[in-house]
Regions:
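Structural signature of tandem alpha-helical TPR/SEL1-like repeats
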Residues: 4-14, 41-50, 77-81
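Amphipathic, hydrophobic secondary-structure cores in small proteins
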Residues: 43, 47-66
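Short helix-capping/linker turns of helical repeat alpha-solenoids
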Residues: 20-24, 37-38, 52, 58-60, ...
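Hydrophobic face of amphipathic alpha-helices that form TPR/SEL1-like repeat modules
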Residues: 29-37, 66-71
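Alpha-helical linker/edge segments of TPR/alpha-solenoid repeat scaffolds
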Residues: 71-98
Length: 98
């Protein structure tokens, strides 16, 4: 179990680093990880929505679809929080929406 947790942590950290460099696919992958609980990661729809939102603003149609799908299972407050986190991440990393 500890090995898979280390693997999941490494995967997430490496995809976040890629996302910070502007990799749209990394954002999409993070959305998938958090929306499905891949690699033993806890499902977190706010975090998933944040990453799908970032991938979507950089042009990923698949992320737009996934974001819409998970939004059906979220409250308006949760969606607003995910959007706030996405904006904060853009500011923090100096990235801009496409």
């Amino acid at each position: 179990m500890a090995h898979s947790l280390k693997s999941a942590t490494f995967l997430i950290e490496s995809r976040i680093a890629d996302a910070a460099r502007g990799d749209c696919n990394a954002c999409y992958d993070l959305g998938i990880i958090y929306s499905t609980g891949a690699s033993g990661t806890a499902i977190d729809l706010i975090e998933a929505h944040k990453w799908f939102n970032l991938a979507a603003v950089w042009g990923s149609e698949a992320a737009q679809s996934c974001r819409s799908d998970i939004a059906e299972d979220m409250t308006a407050r949760e969606i607003a929080e995910a959007q706030r986190q996405a904006r904060a991440w853009l500011v923090q990393t100096g990235r801009r929406a496409a």
